[in-house]
Amino acid sequence: MFSALKKLVGSEQAPGRDKNIPAGLQSMNQALQRRFAKGVQYNMKIVIRGDRNTGKTALWHRLQGKKFVEEYIPTQEIQVTSIHWNYKTTDDVVKVEVWDVVDKGKCKKRGDGLKTENDPQEAESELALDAEFLDVYKNCNGVVMMFDITKQWTFNYVLRELPKVPTHVPVCVLGNYRDMGEHRVILPDDVRDFIEHLDRPPGSSYFRYAESSMKNSFGLKYLHKFFNIPFLQLQRETLLRQLETNQLDIDATLEELSVQQETEDQNYSIFLEMMEARSRGHASPLAANGQSPSSGSQSPVVPPSAVSTGSSSPSTPQPAPQLSLGVSSTCPSAPSPVPSLEAMPSSVHSSAPAPTPAPAPAPAQRRSIISRLFGTSPAAEVTPSPPEPAPALEAPARVQNVEDFVPEDGLDRSFLEDTSVPKDKKVGAKGPQQDSDSDDGEALGGNPMVAGFQDDVDIEDQTHGKSLLPSDPMPSKNISLSSEEEAEGLAGHPRVAPQQCSEPETKWSSTKVSHPQKKRAPTRGTPPWSDGLTTDDSERPQEGKDKQVSSESDPEGPIAAQMLSFVMDDPDFESDESDTQRRMGRFPVREDLSDVTDEDTGPAQPPPPSKLPGAFRLKNDSDLFGLGLEEMGPKESSDEDRDSKLPSKEKKKKKKKSKEEEEKTTKKKSKHKKSKDKEEGKEDRKKKRKPPRSKEQKAADELEAFLGGGAPGSRHPGGGDYEEL
């Protein structure tokens, strides 16, 4: 039976296994499982008894909240279920088990196949779960006795069974089939008279009579309230058991107190002796850790002003030879029951090998251990052994005052840190250095285990500093702009960002040859709306002469500045290529005239290929500054070569330059021809590599005069930087 009950109140079985549950058993409701999972305080058992066909199973279903079934299906075995019920509005979790009891069960063997023959002996051999097999009143808290008011023999069953009910169990006699009252044969007065005259011993439980109808749920509310009596009775029994347990606990405690009164713990003289013995037993192990067991002082009272940062550093341990007498005279705040100082060194000396693995120390070393004793704190228990304890014992005895005493590395340095007395630094510099964990060791040599304020370089500091370089303006390249040109550059568009020099530095010698071509570029590309147009036009003859007489020491400053002013004044300069190179620029110093002007210079007479040095320019079609080259490149190259060879024809050159400026303004309107101009510019750059170097020596004086005239490039250019590299 108990195994069946465990299966009943256990976890719900899978739906596929419901068919395997034997008769009389069922799975528990999910809501009940969640409620009972928190813990059940009371288990109440209600038994429904009665003759056949009196409505026991109908009541059992109704208590579960199920519907009423008209047809009669005889119950073969006892059925048990749990229902929702609680006493009024209390929070007590009550598990109510309702038993549908069958007096005589019939267990039928269920076979998989068809029944072929009758075998009554086999059927009788199996036991059924019924009232004959179980004692249904065991641990029962309430009984519902049912009968049919239309059948007399059902009431006779009640008359037979009521005397068998235990006297302490409350009983509710329920007359069912109240909906068929016109056919009733048992009157309510007959039942009440029988209950009143029932012979029950005094102190027995209660009997109540009620009528019900399972068809229309009449009487269920009364029955629901009747369950309060079994519950309150169960609660009283539980409380009585708790009271009994409480009384037993009181008696046991009184007996323990009587025994405790006679023990040694209640004898004061014995208690004092035990305390003294315990204090002597704990003296030596605690002294090794730097504590005095009988006294509450764990470190000497040292004025904070007597300790400086340098003397409190872990690198300068200072022993105190005469500290034992000084501390005893200058520390009245320590508790009085301190052992005598004569007995203290002996106890400390006996436990000295624990913190310091050195051999037996000398008397001078013993005093240093005493200083070590008073200098330690509870923190010393965590790290009892310093890395180098030996130098502390061998240090000379020079401290003459308690104010000069410095505790050892057991104390927290921040506790006594003060910078008011700088004289301790002299004494601190003489002691050997020791490693420690404190952060005050920067006074002498720094503590390797503690980082400084900014020892680690943040990654953000490096990335920000590097990313800001390409966005710097051009004056960082030793190229200055006039005030007019700077105004145009700021009003028109952003300044030119430094461009990355993608050529190797090993081929820099070729740029010395290309200096004359660099000077010629501004004369061709300067727009007519530039403010510096008159200055550029007035200097055209000198530039024509510079092509022939420029030397390797040519400063290149004026031409570079003019080229830069032209580029910054050009509204069509904002190209994708320039934006890409502005983002890619990593070496802003590399931005020099070689990158600025070689791709925009006018075409020159192609020298013999044998004189060409190693290729320095890029082999791509890209125009760094987004400037369109004219289709008249070959014609201009021939004209400019003729002009460079004939420096006397300056007027003709001015006319040519004005014509080129007009062509430049027309070309800016048609940007779709830039790709074709880039190809021509690439061919022209290959032709202009080698100008005559013998004519470069004549340009120094004229460039100085040109610089003195207030040219925009008065500052020394960055070409010298490349030569130095």
UniProtKB/Swiss-Prot annotation:
Sites bearing Phosphothreonine, chain numbering: T597
Compositional bias annotation for Low complexity: 291-325, 343-353
Entry-annotated residues carrying Phosphoserine: S414, S436, S438, S480, S482, S483, S502, S575, S594, S637, S638, S644
Binding site for GTP: 50-57, 100-104, 177-179
Compositional bias annotation for Basic and acidic residues: 410-427, 537-549, 632-649
Keyword tags: Acetylation, Cytoplasm, GTP-binding, Nucleotide-binding, Nucleus, Phosphoprotein
Stated name of the protein: Rab-like protein 6
UniProt biased composition (Polar residues): 499-514
Gene behind this protein: Rabl6
Region (Disordered): 281-364, 378-725
Biased composition (Gly residues): 707-725
Biased composition (Basic residues): 666-675
Region of interest (Interaction with CDKN2A), ranges: 652-690
One of the Pfam families matching this protein, by short name: Roc
Keyword flag Zinc-finger: no
Role of this protein: May enhance cellular proliferation. May reduce growth inhibitory activity of CDKN2A.
InterPro entries per the UniProt record, alphabetical: P-loop_NTPase, RABL6
GO cellular component: centriolar satellite; ciliary basal body; cytoplasm; cytosol; nucleus
